Amino acid sequence: MSDIIKQIEEEQMKKDVPAFRPGDTLEVKVWVIEGTKKRLQAFEGFVIAIRKRGLNSAFTVRKISNGEGVERVFQTHSPIIDSITVKRRGAVRKAKLYYLRELTGKAARIKERLN
């Protein structure tokens, strides 16, 4: 039974997901449906958490919009995600960057990874 589930999950997983880590700045383009119209919306911010669970994988992106922190959790293999682009690589030493929620201004910056 579990072989059938694994096979179905592998078929539904996206192959074009770029490699990214917490601290990286991403631009996620998402399909938004408003009434009968369908359009692409970009959400750009840095990754504060990644959950790797095969088809159920997810990542959390945080950005500051008009002085307010906005976080959005994306399912990695969701059909509403059109593309994921890595804009900048960040150098951090933790897997979960929840402590950045409390920081503001220059303290909330992430250094750039050079490699």
Swiss-Prot record:
Record protein name field: Large ribosomal subunit protein bL19
The protein's role, per its UniProt record: This protein is located at the 30S-50S ribosomal subunit interface and may play a role in the structure and function of the aminoacyl-tRNA binding site.
Alphabetized Pfam families for the sequence: Ribosomal_L19
Gene3D superfamilies: 2.30.30.790
InterPro entries: Ribosomal_bL19, Ribosomal_bL19_CS, Ribosomal_bL19_sf, Translation_prot_SH3-like_sf
GO cellular component, one term: cytosolic large ribosomal subunit
Family: Belongs to the bacterial ribosomal protein bL19 family.
GO MF term (any one): structural constituent of ribosome
Stored PANTHER family: LARGE RIBOSOMAL SUBUNIT PROTEIN BL19M (PTHR15680:SF9), RIBOSOMAL PROTEIN L19 (PTHR15680)
Any GO BP: translation
UniProt keyword annotations, A-Z: Ribonucleoprotein, Ribosomal protein
Superkingdom to which the source organism belongs: Bacteria
